[in-house]
């Protein structure tokens, strides 16, 4: 009897969690693209013990948006907003460090400084695009990733890597696949969470959510994509840190 | 550098006999077939040595189709290509067969007419490939210039930096002529050019001491891994296909053509080799499955992943080379030289494509560009991708038949008989 009640209760809980987790949006990401393979222990304890979460985003230009109020519409800002919505009662701050045109090696060298300044519980590191643009050797790229991840660990932060954008129009000129493979492999090997932006955006393109081939000078689509990335990223963080909103409320 | 897996060193059995052997064994059927296919090239028959193995044309033709399909990004049809079912892909097949045919054609020239003439022909072939590569580069530039002029999206402000090289056409074009600047998917022909440039002395050695030559090639391969050397690329980095690593496959193909295949036949026919090859192919299949089905990834033990990854295409990872060998062993076993299927009209289109590999390869690269362009312009779905893929292969086949017809017509012209046998000998190309 207790077993059945337990099962029923969990079904209700899971159902509620799913309902709460599902954003009212047109850009949902299927579960298989957000595998909860790792724990973000420092994030978990920052929220559970201190009700506070500091996140640093370190990335190149695809982590930012140009145009009027670009920063406000870029995914780091969207992430902050979504985390605040989904983790109410916590002090949440996302700081973006955009290193335009910097390779992974250059960013890795700057990471200790960023971590010392921000003292974040979570460092989101977006990398790969500039390396693909500049033709960095994938092996050197791997070494730089390792160095950067070491720096993040030394700075007492959880790490989350983000790979490049899916850009179908430049695919015949810019080969990102080898770099995506390296990131996947490094994530696997070190047990670091990887936000697979490439696969997620490709999924949106395949599903017709966004027409990523379209030529436009307007910011509407770019903002919408960043909004969706911010939300998906928040979902993955909450998932990997086991911070499901409903469970949080029950524990408090 | 990446730790090279050690337990699967190139498993090339080196037989004791080192007699230079120009001619592979031949069956009457194969001979008549090759004679038939080379009707336009009387010199091939006249030489009377081993005739062309139609399996080479067949598999090179198939490899050309697969390379075309793989070169269209976002192509649903590319799911059928072998790279999704194992470690190696069509590139390995293409390079191996190219080495095999190069040795077959130029080996005979070198044996009969000397080192200088054979070298001159090899270098002329390299020049032809160079010209073809530059032609493809021009088409690529046209596409890029079009995208640069028409495509804009703030979302891709960063990615569009790739077009910056258009701002320096002097540097870019010069680097392209030096084969240092190579657009995506245009790496195979430069590799082929370098392999041919280095081929004359290698062929000389292969004809005299084939096993020594092969061992030398393996040493260069090992050194390339150990010392991490490769040719430089522009603006950065190195060649996508490291010629010092990939030469092993080319030389191995050449070695097989010059009697190595004959010497290996007992190994290839043994049951143990077959079992090992099939087991390895199944293993590779299981591993590649975990790349496509994320949830299966956890079944790959960490120690295995640590040892195995990354599987390096640039330096022809040993796992890839072994996978190609396994594929070859199984293929040779089940598709004998005199297999009647080689005469069936169903396989004829692939064979004809394989017999004109340079033209069809270039056409394939161009069609991949064009197909991708159509798909991008129309934001086409799976249906259009399928249509583009099928139409592309039909165009490749039609062109191959046209070239065949053209060569036959030229061959009938009495004046052209004076022409020396070329790489196109026996209906195929080096």
Language-model segment annotations:
Chain A
Residues 167-252:
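Catalytic His-Asp segment of secreted/periplasmic serine-dependent ester chemistry enzymes
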Residues 54-56, 90-118, 130-161:
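Internal alpha/beta domain cores that form substrate/cofactor-binding pockets in large enzymes
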Residues 2-9:
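Sec-dependent signal peptide recognition
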Residues 24-96, 112-119:
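Serine-esterase "nucleophile elbow" of acetyl-processing enzymes
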């Amino acid at each position: 009897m207790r077993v059945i009640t337990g099962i029923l209760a969990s079904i209700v809980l899971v159902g509620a969690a799913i309902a709460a987790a599902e954003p009212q949006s047109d850009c949902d990401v299927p579960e298989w693209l957000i595998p909860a393979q790792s724990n973000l222990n420092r994030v978990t304890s920052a929220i559970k013990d201190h009700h506070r979460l500091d996140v640093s985003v370190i990335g190149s230009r695809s982590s930012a948006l140009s145009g009027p109020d670009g920063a406000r519409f870029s995914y780091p800002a969207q992430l902050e907003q979504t985390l605040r919505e989904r983790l109410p009662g916590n002090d949440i701050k996302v700081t973006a460090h955009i290193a335009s045109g910097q390779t992974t090696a250059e960013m890795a060298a700057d990471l200790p400084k960023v971590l010392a300044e921000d003292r974040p519980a979570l460092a989101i590191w977006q990398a790969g695009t500039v390396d693909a643009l500049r033709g960095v050797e994938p092996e050197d790229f791997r070494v730089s990733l390792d160095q950067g991840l070491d720096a993040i660990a030394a700075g007492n932060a959880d790490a989350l890597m983000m790979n490049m954008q899916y850009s179908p129009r430049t695919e015949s000129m810019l080969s990102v696949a080898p770099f995506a493979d390296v990131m996947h492999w490094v994530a696997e090997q070190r047990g670091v969470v990887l936000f697979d932006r490439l696969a997620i955006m490709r999924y949106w393109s395949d599903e017709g959510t966004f027409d990523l081939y379209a030529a436009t000078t307007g910011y509407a689509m770019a903002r919408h994509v960043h909004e969706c990335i911010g939300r998906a990223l928040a979902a993955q963080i909450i998932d990997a840190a086991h911070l499901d909103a409903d469970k949080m409320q029950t524990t408090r | 550098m990446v730790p090279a897996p050690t337990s699967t060193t190139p498993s090339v059995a080196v037989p004791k006999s080192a007699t230079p052997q120009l001619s592979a064994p031949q069956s009457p059927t194969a001979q008549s077939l090759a004679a038939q296919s080379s009707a336009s090239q009387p010199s091939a028959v006249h030489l009377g040595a081993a005739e062309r193995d139609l399996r080479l044309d067949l598999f090179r033709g198939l490899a050309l189709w697969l390379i075309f399909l793989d070169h269209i990004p976002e192509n649903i049809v590319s799911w059928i290509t072998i790279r999704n079912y194992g470690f190696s892909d069509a590139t390995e097949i293409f390079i191996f067969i190219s080495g095999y045919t190069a040795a077959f054609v130029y080996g005979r020239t070198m044996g009969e007419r000397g080192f200088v003439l054979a070298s001159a022909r090899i270098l002329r072939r390299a020049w032809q490939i160079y010209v073809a590569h530059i032609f493809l580069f021009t088409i690529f530039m046209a596409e890029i210039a079009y995208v640069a002029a028409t495509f804009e999206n703030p979302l891709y402000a960063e990615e569009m930096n790739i077009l910056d090289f258009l701002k320096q056409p002097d540097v870019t074009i010069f680097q392209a002529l030096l084969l240092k600047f190579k657009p995506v998917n245009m790496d195979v022909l430069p590799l082929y050019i370098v392999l041919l440039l280095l081929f004359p002395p290698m062929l000389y050695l292969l004809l005299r001491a084939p096993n020594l030559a092969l061992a030398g090639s393996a040493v260069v391969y090992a050194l390339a891994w150990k010392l991490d050397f490769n040719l430089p690329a522009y603006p950065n980095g190195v060649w996508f296909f490291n010629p010092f690593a990939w030469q092993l496959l080319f030389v191995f193909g050449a070695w097989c053509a010059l009697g190595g295949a004959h010497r290996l036949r007992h190994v290839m026919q043994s049951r143990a080799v077959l079992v090992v090859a099939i087991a390895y192919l199944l293993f590779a299949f299981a591993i590649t499955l975990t790349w496509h089905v994320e949830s299966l990834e956890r079944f790959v033990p960490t120690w295995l992943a640590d040892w195995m990854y990354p599987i390096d295409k640039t330096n022809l990872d040993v796992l890839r080379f072994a996978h190609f060998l396994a594929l070859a062993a199984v293929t040779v076993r089940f598709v004998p030289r005199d297999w009647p299927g080689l005469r069936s009209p169903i396989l004829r289109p692939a064979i004809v494509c394989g017999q004109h590999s340079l033209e069809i390869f270039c056409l394939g690269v161009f069609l991949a560009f064009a197909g991708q362009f159509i798909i991008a312009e129309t934001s086409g779905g799976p249906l259009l991708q399928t249509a583009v893929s099928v139409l592309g292969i039909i165009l490749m086949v039609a062109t191959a038949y046209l070239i065949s017809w053209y060569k036959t017509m030229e061959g009938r012209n009495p004046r052209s008989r004076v022409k020396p046998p070329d790489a196109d000998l026996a209906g195929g190309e080096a």
